[in-house]
Amino acid sequence: MDNMTMGAKNNRAVNIFVVMLCQSFQTVSGAGIAHFLPSIRSNLNLSFTQAGTLSAATIFSYALMQIPAGYLADRYGLKRIFFIGVLGTTALCLTFGLVPRYWHALVNQTASGIFHALLFQAGLALLASWFGAQRRATAMGLSLVGIFAGQLLINALGPWLVEHFGWRFPFISFGFVGILASFIYLRLGQESQDTQSREKLRIADALRLFRHRFMWVCGIIQYVRLGVMQGIAFWLPTLLIDEQGLALQVTGSIIALRTLLIAPSNLLGGYISDRLKRPTAVMGISLVILAMTTAALAKVNDVALLIALIFINAIFIQFYFGPLFAVPVEKYGTHMAGTLSGFGNFFANLGAFTFTYLLGALKDQTGYFESGFYAMAGACLLGLIFTVLLEGMRRH
């Protein structure tokens, strides 16, 4: 019995590890584009608006695929959909390093969003399936640790690679390693018994969620969450380099430390939510702090104070990720985990599309990021209002 128990624990650990390994490549391409944007803009001759559309195109196709990806994962098997998502994402990361002009880059990133959705939805459900119901927010938060590990690596190693080999090399090298990781998962990865025994969903089950006011409230908060997250993540390097005059290496160090703070804070938020059984309290506190720090980022000129604000903002920007994804599963059940996360992430990526494009367009119009950061701070206050509404709905 002890040997069987030990074997089950080892099997669980291996599966969690290979899923997180593959998840680490999900946003490498987007993080690299944001970090090396000045070099990419110069080489491909892009305006700020065009640069913003590279991120917006990925987010738009990613958003449209959220519910279909969740449904496909629940209907046809998490392992199969996850492998397709990882392989497609990493292959397109590699080929982004080969694009000769803007339109090629735009098509590449649009296609990338489709595979990102498959990777994210299946990966989120795979991790959740290896944890019990009492640790659901922690499990869902764990998925971001893998994602941010990839961002941390490209932000830490990328500037050195760009300096010695040019901006294309990080995409080619990370993409190649990611393709290898996808086949490691294919060889070692398994689905838990929970996922293998689940009832297959119908399309009508997924579409029926649009009738539920509870899901619309969660969706609006998701819109704010990723809108603010992606708006800051994509444009912060440009803010530091173009408006604050920091060097690429210094900016890379700041972004890497910021990423290093996000991953554990996300886990901590999920843990606190699970222990206290107060997910909306975690969400509300996070949104208040984000509103204040995001607004302050637009006005502060002192570099030391700006860096402190960036780090405080980073601690709370995904602090409520796990609780927000866990609340719908708490209400509707684990058999719909992929579809529920797809619904929430559809709204989340509409927010990300809105703010990445909006900040680029406002930068072109005004020459500064100030108005864009104020808009994100206002969105945080809107999210706070809907969090209060969500708590009332949970109580009843």
Located regions from the model:
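C-terminal transmembrane helical hairpin of 12-TM major facilitator-type secondary transporters
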Residues: 279-327
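Cytoplasmic helix-loop-helix junction between adjacent transmembrane helices
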Residues: 108-147
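Helix-to-loop junctions at the C-terminal end of transmembrane segments
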Residues: 65-77, 266-277, 363-364
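Extracytoplasmic gate region of multi-pass secondary transporters
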Residues: 33-35, 213-266
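Conserved MFS/SLC helix-loop-helix module at the cytosolic interface between two early adjacent transmembrane helices
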Residues: 64-103
